[in-house]
Design a protein with these regions (language model features):
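Terminal amphipathic helices with adjacent charged low-complexity linkers/tails
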Residues: 1-53
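Intrinsically disordered, low-complexity N-terminal regions enriched in serine/proline/glycine
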Residues: 7, 20, 34, 39, ...
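Charge-dense, low-complexity intrinsically disordered segments
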Residues: 15, 19, 66-70, 360
């Protein structure tokens, strides 16, 4: 300070410097105002969502006429086929558009000299992609989404954490969400990634079980102004679990009852994503042996944790035995099952094999789980 002849107290700004700084502020005020007006111009999202819902109702109606197994990455693409018409939805992928199903026939590529499109080819750069999406969300009213494999979410973590911290509406499409991706083996099969993402404050981690839940999770993500969202999707086809048409968004509560075999039950089974159809099979198999249960589909733990105590008790406290099933690391489910519950999942690195064989290897099949539940009872 002495060498620089700086004789001011800490945090004291010399008047001459302060005046010069304020001149810059005045000079830039009008430019800042014009920039803000241009980039935050009001696009009527509510009106556009109403138009979108009309198209979605038609897809749902057609879907229930012909229920069949579909990968949730495919059902997400079906949503994007109509949602890509939203004027402020900007898509992209880290060179995995064909695998993530993030690009549809309605997308136009953003490229040098032509920024009128709504889809960005980011290249093999997950970290850069998520940083760019943060910037898009921060400076405009645009809603960015980008895709990669769930295993590569680790490359995205710093930017995801910042999006959650800054309360930005950014949507991450993470496909190939479990050992269900099959032969690519343990290097590409996510195990601990869902737990890691769920531990980030102010981040919704969705893992939908079928087309209906996928559409519901997308709907919530688009409407969540202050919270970024992960949507984890399957590579493999899975059986639909919602078999009756409903226009109410049941996923908004994070977890809800999807199946019950009797009024008085012995077991609560909680599951997410591709394992929800497995949970339903187990529920029916137990009923043939006079053991009655209910299945709770939980596409979003964070939303469930926000529910009131009465609702959570209704879901979790009806039975002494609570069981969780998810093809992922299991520890994060113990807050629901308790120490006396059962947690079925994958607590080791995966294997390279057809996905059904890998599920059998880790005991994620109807017969194995039914037997272990009976032993517990």
């Amino acid at each position: 300070r002495k060498k620089l002849n700086w004789n001011y107290e800490p945090f004291q700004i010399p008047k001459k410097m302060l005046n010069e700084w304020r001149k810059i502020g005045v000079k830039a005020h009008e430019k800042s105002k014009k920039f803000k007006n241009k980039n935050h111009s009001s696009i009527n999202l509510t009106k556009n969502l109403k138009l979108l819902n009309t198209s979605i109702k038609k897809i749902k109606n057609d879907y229930f006429k012909n229920l069949k197994p579909l990968a949730t990455r495919k059902t997400s693409e079906m949503f994007l086929n109509v949602a890509s018409k939203l004027p402020n939805l900007i898509g992209g992928s880290a060179d995995l558009a064909g695998s993530n199903n993030t690009k549809t026939k309605n997308h136009k590529i953003i490229k040098p000299g032509d920024f009128s499109g709504n889809y960005i080819h980011y290249g093999v750069r997950e970290h850069a992609m998520c940083g760019v999406m943060n910037g898009i969300a921060l400076h405009s009213n645009l809603i960015p989404y980008g895709g990669t494999f769930l295993i590569f979410s680790d490359y995205c973590k710093p930017s995801i954490r910042l999006a959650a911290m800054m309360k930005q509406r950014v949507i991450y499409i993470f496909t190939h969400d479990s050992i269900g991706l099959g032969e690519d083996g343990p290097t590409h099969q996510p195990i601990e990634q869902l737990t890691s993402l769920r531990s980030i404050p102010n981040l919704y981690v969705f893992r939908p079980a079928d087309l209906i839940e996928t559409f519901e999770c997308w709907d919530i993500a688009i409407k969540s102004k202050d919270t970024p969202s992960v949507i984890a999707l399957t590579r493999q086809g899975i059986n639909p679990v919602r078999r009756k048409i409903s226009y109410k968004n049941k996923s908004e509560r994070g977890g809800y009852e999807i199946l019950r075999t009797k009024d008085k039950i012995d077991i609560t089974i909680i599951s997410s994503g591709s394992e929800t159809s497995l949970a339903c099979e187990i529920c029916h198999k137990l009923a043939t042996e006079n053991i009655y249960s209910k299945v709770i589909s939980m596409p979003c733990q964070e939303l469930f944790d926000q529910q009131n105590k009465i609702y959570k008790n209704k879901i979790l406290s009806e039975t002494e035995l609570v069981v969780s099933i998810e093809a992922s690391e299991t520890h994060y489910w113990k807050k629901y099952t308790g120490a006396s519950g059962l947690n079925f999942g994958v607590n080791d690195f995966g294997k390279s094999a057809p996905y059904k064989k890998i599920y059998d290897h880790f005991g994620l099949n109807t017969d194995t789980i039914v037997q272990k539940i009976k032993e517990k009872l």
